[in-house]
Amino acid sequence: ATFRLNNMIEIIQNWNDYILDSKYLPQRSATFLINENNEVPEINVRNNYKGIDQAYRKPIQLRLIQDIEDPNYRQIFILPAASYNLYDGLSLGLRWYNRTILPKPLHFNLEPQYALNSQSPVGRGSVIYNRWNETSNLFLQRFGIAGNYFSYDQGLFYRRLSPYTIFAFRDNSNLRKNKRQYLTLRSVHVTRDKALAQVDREPNYSVYNLQFNYSDNNLINFYSAAFNAQLSSAFSKVSAQFEYRKLFLNNRQINLRFYAGLFLRNGPNPMSSV
């Protein structure tokens, strides 16, 4: 059944039988709702609303502590948050996030806090956007950014910002296979307040990271491999890690792990004397 709504009030109800692909519903300005009374069982009902004129947006609902998702609202969950830092002391605040059991395209997590010792606002936050493609070997693209702001000394603060991108691959012709490949591009940028009476031996820095992960996660035979490359103004290195696990019939298992790394360049940062 298709329900046509006006200001969230039902005005027309249509029953549509034998829709194999798509059907045109002539209406210039309206909001459509399908499967309102759950005649057809489904898990994900959050996309059952569609505003034709794009003016319709689900109302925002604030909930204290995470609860069962309500598909009629854009829910934001609130939790008390606390952290401790030697220079900030006890920091108190609220965590605002929208993560639910079922994944969403857009996730955010914001934790603004107030530090009692430094008497300054501090906190952390992250935003993640997921893009799925169920018909391709590249089944997931994830774009995210995370950051925080805290004290590292009396009256001195640091800022850390880390944007990243993840490409996830699988064999789309056989979804029963557990083989996965992940390509991650990430960078970490740290800036700090500089003390006037102190020579800074660890100045602001940035690290760029390229990582490839392969895994075949099975109960009896497990394989994984990871290749990592890091580059900064002070060093550059590459590393590799391999792991194999075998489960036997007597419930015993053997786990083998190999790791190797090499610094291609490891010297003082040319900016350390500035």
Predicted feature locations:
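Outer-membrane beta-barrel initiation region
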Residues: L5-N7, S22-Y24, I34-L140, G155, ...
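Exposed aromatic-hydrophobic patches
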Residues: Q13-P26, S126, Y164
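A glycine-rich phosphate-binding loop feature that marks nucleotide/adenosyl-phosphate handling sites
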Residues: Y49-D53, L183-S187, G261
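Solvent-exposed serine/threonine-rich low-complexity stretches and specific carbohydrate-binding patches
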Residues: F3-N16
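Short, solvent-exposed aromatic-acidic interface loops
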Residues: E10-I12, E39, G147-N148, V190
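Surface-exposed loop/interface segments of Gram-negative outer-membrane beta-barrel transport/assembly proteins
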Residues: D171-T191, D200-E202, S272-V274
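C-terminal outer-membrane beta-barrel translocator/porin domains of Gram-negative envelope proteins
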Residues: P80-A82, L140-G155, R160-I166, D171, ...
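Extracellular Ig-like/FN3 beta-sandwich strand-entry sites
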Residues: Q27-T31
